[in-house]
Design a protein with these regions (language model features):
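Active-site environment of divalent metal-dependent phosphoester hydrolases
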Residues: 10-15, 40-43, 64-70, 124, ...
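Short active-site oxyanion
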Residues: 57, 147-150, 197-199
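Core catalytic region of metal-dependent phosphoesterases/phosphodiesterases
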Residues: 2-98
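His/acidic metal-ligating clusters that form di-metal
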Residues: 26-28, 89-161
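Acidic, His/Gly-rich catalytic cores of divalent-metal-dependent hydrolytic chemistry
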Residues: 163-235
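Beta-strand-turn-beta hairpins that frame and shape the catalytic cleft
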Residues: 1-4, 105-115, 164-168, 197-198
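Metallo-beta-lactamase
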Residues: 31, 127-131, 138, 166-168, ...
Length: 235
């Protein structure tokens, strides 16, 4: 069993297309799960949603997807981006985001399951950062069923793998807005092999200059901040 995990596309259609092209070359992929944060903060929110709707994949909801369909009140800069994004995706796109589930469980007939969430199994906001201490992990993960052998997620935009009490934790990184000092698009492949889940992190080059040009020309408010994040790939 091989499952691809994409997360945090953030309206970056160029990066998404590059990842899908790389993914098409990987053998034995049985399913794709997109772990939320689909369209806010990037130049092509509608194009990203249109692409995802054509794919044979599962898509779950992220925190900024919630912001878009709920029109959650934020500071004036973020509110401007939310309003612009809603205008781009229209009522159909807003309804699509609202209908997305919180999580996706991949049942494994040969062993433990894979659970995919956006940030953590309890909410869409608190990040599972690599340095999280045991007591906090217990709070966020301690009630997962024993049948869960791997947890895949995004939200933090930093790709990493660690184990906690036998549970494989995999942050797929960000497809469209990495922040781990690597400007390449990120995704992960989880494989059930030798009675255990294993993770492979993949990085894919894409035309960053084209995305910067799109951001400058698309009319999205506060685009300069997004350009800085894309070109520096860090917090």
């Amino acid at each position: 069993m091989r499952i691809a995990i994409l997360a945090d596309i953030h309206g970056n259609q160029v990066a998404l297309e590059a990842v899908l092209e790389d993914l098409a070359q990987q053998a034995g992929i049985e399913h794709i799960v997109v772990a939320g944060d689909l369209c806010l903060n990037g130049p092509c929110p509608k194009e990203v949603l249109d692409t995802l709707r054509t794919l044979p994949c599962s898509v779950i909801q992220g925190n900024v997807d919630n912001d878009v369909f709920n029109e959650t009140k934020k500071g004036p800069k973020k509110q401007g981006i939310v309003t612009w994004t809603r205008e781009q995706i229209g009522a159909e796109g807003i309804d699509y985001l609202a209908a997305l589930p919180f999580s996706k469980r991949i049942e494994n007939p040969d062993g433990t399951d894979l659970l995919v969430v956006h940030a953590n199994p309890l909410d869409q906001e608190e990040a599972l950062v690599p340095s999280l201490q045991d007591n906090k992990l217990e709070q966020l993960l301690g009630k997962l069923p024993a049948t869960t052998g791997a947890l895949a997620f995004g939200h933090y935009h930093v790709a990493y793998t660690r184990r906690w009490r036998g549970l494989l934790l995999v942050d797929a990184g960000s497809c469209g807005m990495p922040r781990d000092e690597d400007i390449r698009a990120s995704y992960a492949i989880l494989t059930w092999r030798d009675d255990a889940w294993q993770a492979e992190h993949r990085r894919v080059k894409y035309d960053l200059k084209a995305v910067v040009k799109q951001l400058k020309n698309c009319g999205m408010p506060n685009a300069d901040k997004r350009i800085k994040i894309l070109t520096e790939a860090k917090y």
